[in-house]
Amino acid sequence: MTQNDLMSELKQQALVDINEAKDAQALQEVKVKYLGKKGSVSGLMKNMKDLPNEDKPAYGQKVNELRQTIQSELDERQKLIKEEKLNQQLSEETIDVTLPSRHIEIGSKHPLTRTVEEIEDLFLGLGYEIVDGYEVEQDYYNFEALNLPKSHPARDMQDSFYITEEILMRTHTSPVQARTMEKRKGQGPVKIICPGKVYRRDSDDATHSHQFTQIEGLVVDKDIKMSDLKGTLELVAKKLFGADREIRLRPSYFPFTEPSVEVDVSCFKCKGQGCNVCKHTGWIEILGAGMVHPNVLEMAGFDSKEYSGFAFGMGPDRIAMLKYGIEDIRHFYTNDVRFLDQFKAVEDRGEQ
């Protein structure tokens, strides 16, 4: 039998084996049988050493053509096997299009989002502007521009996440106020609220979190008085907690305001009679506020003899906890669907 006859017979046998392969594994075995290192086609190349030199190029070309033919047939058969497998799956996994579709879960706004939007809508109605700022902030705007120089003892009041010596995660949204006043270049009025996330090195527990939400407000203009602040806070308390709420101002200390006050609202659960929510005092602390310190105005470019202002800061987390009777602040951040589903029902009823 000549070499040509041997190649022709080998080709025919390879085509038969390829067509008889029913799956990918069988096809791989055929490939190894003919094209593997110890396969039949590779064996033909070993015979080349016995041929005269003038016959070797033609012989090598024919062996390569045989290899290419077998490889091409293998590729076609592999494609056909994949198609057959897919068609079989489709026939076995038929879908009854008349069956009802899967129930699609409809989400709702997060309770913190609802509370923040409620507060934003309230202040937009009062003519305030909403201003965003940087969460990664410069030490200057977070502290020094707010009357807290590097040597000020009040810096110990809030441990901070420092990235470098001069860059940190903001500990409050007050830097937005400082930057906004600086941009206005001493020209009033300024009437803004600054919502956003803030960061402090607190150990997480039922009432503390290393990350929480804060909304601060600022009004700067000529002839702004403490009575303007009190009237604003009374309106906010009634809108958030009920029309029959009263507020109480207690003297306090914040480096960036003077005078400074803590603001309490009469308990909406016991109507001031005393209960677990208000710790039997009849009052619930909701925010801090005060008249903008003259040093803060001056550092931002405002003449403190011509301009005055008030500022306040509130925590939507705490307000949401009070409004919805939530005992642990960590529930807001654990993404527990059982917890969040409760507020979908509130939203469906159109309640605030």
UniProtKB/Swiss-Prot annotation:
Keywords: Aminoacyl-tRNA synthetase, ATP-binding, Cytoplasm, Ligase, Magnesium, Metal-binding, Nucleotide-binding, Protein biosynthesis
Catalytic activity: tRNA(Phe) + L-phenylalanine + ATP = L-phenylalanyl-tRNA(Phe) + AMP + diphosphate + H(+)
Enzyme Commission numbers on file: 6.1.1.20
GO MF terms, alphabetically ordered: ATP binding; catalytic activity, acting on a protein; magnesium ion binding; phenylalanine-tRNA ligase activity; transferase activity; tRNA binding
GO cellular component: cytoplasm
Subunit structure: Tetramer of two alpha and two beta subunits.
Name of the protein in question: Phenylalanine--tRNA ligase alpha subunit
Source species: Staphylococcus epidermidis (strain ATCC 12228 / FDA PCI 1200)
Higher taxonomy: Bacteria, Bacillati, Bacillota, Bacilli, Bacillales
